[in-house]
Amino acid sequence: MSKKEVAIYTDGACSGNPGAGGWAAIILFQDYRKDIYGREENTTNNKMELTAVINGLKVLKFSCNINLYTDSLYVKHGITEWINKWKMNGWKTSNKKSVKNMELWKELDNVASQHEIDWKWVKAHSGDKYNEEADSLARKAIIDA
């Protein structure tokens, strides 16, 4: 049986950085759509971006082929370029400093390993329908305390 084809759009937002933050993911499979979002106090935009991706992937019950869309180059570069070097260096950067948000990166690495993922960067606020909707949900999460 072939893997299901899924699209996930994610976004994170912060009111202040650090400050109250929101994250959102829109999961699309055939005619099915699921929106998830949440809020955290005293967080950062990058943490919210990572949290959005992690929670979007956790929704999936089976191994899938995923097109994952993020407007965060931090997430895209981190998972596609930097993470393997960090792991080889004991979760240290090239400057020998601990990787920021290491626990979230480890969790993302774990949940992502269960899927085939094509990581795609979308320019924020450029008119991409689902990216705009994920952004709205993440911002809504901040104010819906």
Curated annotation (Swiss-Prot):
<feature type="binding site">
    <location>
        <position position="11"/>
    </location>
    <ligand>
        <name>Mg(2+) 2</name>
    </ligand>
</feature>
<keyword id="KW-0540">Nuclease</keyword>
<comment type="function">
    <text>Endonuclease that specifically degrades the RNA of RNA-DNA hybrids.</text>
</comment>
<feature type="binding site">
    <location>
        <position position="71"/>
    </location>
    <ligand>
        <name>Mg(2+) 1</name>
    </ligand>
</feature>
<feature type="binding site">
    <location>
        <position position="11"/>
    </location>
    <ligand>
        <name>Mg(2+) 1</name>
    </ligand>
</feature>
<dbReference type="GO" id="GO:0004523">
    <property type="term" value="F:RNA-DNA hybrid ribonuclease activity"/>
</dbReference>
<dbReference type="InterPro" id="IPR022892">
    <property type="entry name" value="RNaseHI"/>
</dbReference>
<dbReference type="InterPro" id="IPR050092">
    <property type="entry name" value="RNase_H"/>
</dbReference>
<dbReference type="Pfam" id="PF00075">
    <property type="entry name" value="RNase_H"/>
</dbReference>
<keyword id="KW-0255">Endonuclease</keyword>
<dbReference type="InterPro" id="IPR036397">
    <property type="entry name" value="RNaseH_sf"/>
</dbReference>
<feature type="binding site">
    <location>
        <position position="49"/>
    </location>
    <ligand>
        <name>Mg(2+) 1</name>
    </ligand>
</feature>
<dbReference type="InterPro" id="IPR012337">
    <property type="entry name" value="RNaseH-like_sf"/>
</dbReference>
<dbReference type="GO" id="GO:0005737">
    <property type="term" value="C:cytoplasm"/>
</dbReference>
<keyword id="KW-0378">Hydrolase</keyword>
<keyword id="KW-0963">Cytoplasm</keyword>
<dbReference type="GO" id="GO:0000287">
    <property type="term" value="F:magnesium ion binding"/>
</dbReference>
<comment type="similarity">
    <text>Belongs to the RNase H family.</text>
</comment>
<keyword id="KW-0460">Magnesium</keyword>
<dbReference type="GO" id="GO:0043137">
    <property type="term" value="P:DNA replication, removal of RNA primer"/>
</dbReference>
<comment type="subunit">
    <text>Monomer.</text>
</comment>
<feature type="domain" description="RNase H type-1">
    <location>
        <begin position="2"/>
        <end position="143"/>
    </location>
</feature>
<keyword id="KW-0479">Metal-binding</keyword>
<dbReference type="InterPro" id="IPR002156">
    <property type="entry name" value="RNaseH_domain"/>
</dbReference>
<feature type="binding site">
    <location>
        <position position="135"/>
    </location>
    <ligand>
        <name>Mg(2+) 2</name>
    </ligand>
</feature>
<dbReference type="GO" id="GO:0003676">
    <property type="term" value="F:nucleic acid binding"/>
</dbReference>
<protein>
    <recommendedName>
        <fullName>Ribonuclease H</fullName>
        <ecNumber>3.1.26.4</ecNumber>
    </recommendedName>
</protein>
